[in-house]
Amino acid sequence: MKIIFFFALLAIAACSASAQFDAVTQVYRQYQLQPHLMLQQQMLSPCGEFVRQQCSTVATPFFQSPVFQLRNCQVMQQQCCQQLRMIAQQSHCQAISSVQAIVQQLRLQQFASVYFDQSQAQAQAMLALNMPSICGIYPSYNTAPCSIPTVGGIWY
């Protein structure tokens, strides 16, 4: 009886490990097939940080002056705008999606156990959507608007 139980447990563990391996392999293949998306996300990390911080003095730690925070925000915004300008016109929606993905990833990493603020997520999503116009980058008139989902399931 113990042997049967042991083999059943071993079979379950093997199936679970196989499923996890398949999932990891699928993600790896996806990134292999789309290396430009990973590169784009890396390029847009200043945008993700800018959006995540929302560059408000409310988020300023007590040991940083508001002037330092403003200067830091200006630098991040300039870096973000430079990176957005490097992205081809037809992929601006992808760029915005990448910024949103970065923001969501940062939130999951840093605030996994803290209360999630829906209004802050919406404000970040709106800021991410407006980054191209903040940078003075406007799509051509025949370009369709972007539709970006947020964590709360709201589309912009």
Swiss-Prot record:
Keywords: Pyrrolidone carboxylic acid, Seed storage protein, Signal, Storage protein, Vacuole. InterPro entries: Bifun_inhib/LTP/seed_sf, Bifunc_inhib/LTP/seed_store, Glia_glutenin. GO terms for molecular function: nutrient reservoir activity. It is found in: Vacuole, Aleurone grain. Residues 1-19 form the signal peptide. The modification Pyrrolidone carboxylic acid is found at Q20. Its main location: other. Gene3D superfamilies: Plant lipid-transfer and hydrophobic proteins. Disulfide bonds: none annotated. It comes from the Eukaryota. SMART domains: AAI. GO terms for cellular component: aleurone grain; vacuole. Belongs to the prolamin family. Lacks significant tandem repetitive sequences. Seed storage protein; serves as a source of nitrogen, carbon and sulfur for the young developing seedling. This is Prolamin PPROL 17D. The lineage of its organism: Eukaryota, Viridiplantae, Streptophyta, Embryophyta, Tracheophyta.
